[in-house]
């Protein structure tokens, strides 16, 4: 189980995250939605151990992720919105770095994200969509039980969006936990729960409330209002 417990975070005088608490169970996908700049990425960075909260805890299977970086490395795969890759290296070298070993790279990950013909290519020469696929593949090499994805299908065409989402479903079937930030209606519809972030606070839609009509009304309301950065 992934637990987010009373997380608070300020940027300057702005309260970006205000007493955020929720949990994610094995095999569950949770979508976090909100306007650009509302704090979604900040929350994922805290959950991934990249950023420290002012208050609160992140627990992976009961272990406090803030106190032990080994817990984060063992349990969490993180796909940030910004490109985390080593641009000067090849695709294969990036995969090896993220795997933390020079052993043979998992073939199923390479095949799933169609990287076979790109292994010797320098990352700097890849398109934005190819880099995105590689970033997701890197996060998945160790098949972590927790996967945090910030706008995972950004820069992908419809074919690869569908491919990534199919893969997420397979991952969930094997009891993986997924938290995504997204503006994509189909991704929201495919989630078990939807958390709406506004003014530093989360409200939740249950599965039976996640309808296309509710999502569009929700997005329209969010687009009418500003959010924290």
Label for each model-derived stretch:
Residues 33-35:
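The feature captures the beta-strand-to-loop junction immediately N-terminal to the Walker
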Residues 48:
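Helix-to-loop junction immediately C-terminal to a conserved catalytic motif
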Residues 136:
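Hydrophobic anchor residue at the start of the ABC signature
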Residues 147-151:
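Catalytic Walker B motif of ABC-type/P-loop ATPase nucleotide-binding domains
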Residues 56-67, 71-72:
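Conserved ABC transporter NBD signature motif
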Residues 103-119:
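Conserved ABC ATPase "signature" region
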């Amino acid at each position: 189980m992934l637990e987010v417990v009373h997380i608070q975070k300020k940027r300057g005088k702005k309260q970006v995250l205000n007493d955020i608490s929720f949990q994610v169970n094995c095999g569950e996908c949770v979508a976090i939605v909100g306007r650009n700049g509302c704090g979604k990425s900040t929350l994922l960075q805290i959950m991934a151990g990249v950023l420290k909260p002012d208050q609160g805890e992140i627990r992976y299977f009961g272990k406090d992720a803030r106190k032990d970086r080994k817990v984060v490395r063992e349990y969490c795969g993180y796909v940030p919105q910004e490109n985390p890759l080593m641009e000067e290296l090849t695709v294969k070298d990036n995969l090896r770095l993220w795997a933390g070993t020079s052993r043979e790279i998992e073939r199923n990950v390479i095949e799933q994200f169609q990287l076979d013909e790109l292994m010797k290519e320098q990352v700097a020469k890849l398109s934005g969509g190819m880099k995105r696929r590689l970033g997701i593949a890197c996060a998945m090499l160790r098949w972590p039980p927790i996967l945090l994805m910030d706008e995972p299908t950004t820069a992908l065409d419809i074919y690869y969006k569908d491919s990534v989402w199919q893969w997420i479903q397979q991952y969930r079937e094997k009891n993986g936990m997924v938290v995504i930030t997204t503006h994509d209606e189909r991704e929201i519809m495919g989630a078990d729960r939807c958390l709406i972030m506004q003014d530093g606070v989360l409200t939740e839609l249950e599965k039976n409330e996640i309808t296309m009509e509710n999502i569009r009304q929700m997005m329209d309301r969010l687009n009418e209002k500003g959010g924290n950065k």
